[in-house]
Amino acid sequence: GIVASFAKIFTNNFITNNSPLFNIHLSLLPKYKGPTPVESALFNLENFSGYTIFKINKNIDTGDIIYQKKVNIEGKYASEVYQQIYESFQIDILNIDFYKKGQIQENLVSNTRKFFKDDFNIQELTLQNAKTKIRAFDYLGPAFLKYNNINLKILNYSEMEQGSSIELSDGLLYPLYVIPEGKSKMLFEDYLRG
């Protein structure tokens, strides 16, 4: 069987009795093991990430790799990366040899961590760092700041320097869609009009 984002550790007995088991992990293992591989890759300004299918063993995200697919993530939002990987996997799964000998994971091991609400705050950040967090956390967060004394979640932004903006420490951010505290998703321009 294949599992994805199962967030559980199988017992050795379960693995033995149900072998082979495979996991799809949304990074190019052994890089970005753990719960937030897509967000961490974007947060760290990686240009490429992808997904890995590996044989499940008793340790977390360490089994032999049977397939990897590299994708360009430069400038993308996490939700776009998830969609890109999902679409790629739907095609690739038809041609994956699940019974070949896997490759042992070596070198470049890195781990991810769980992100919390404070991680999504862009209030005191530079423009570039705020944009990075908005892209990395659009699915998990989203990024937010205090604006007119309320929490304003920023879903995305424009690179075009036109329209209404929010002043950050070193530049202007041009939000497109926001979620004001206690309200639904709306255009930033509509929010400003009240």
Language-model segments: which ranges?
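Donor/substrate-binding cores of folate-linked one-carbon enzymes
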Residues: 2-114, 118
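Internal anion-binding site segments
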Residues: 106-194
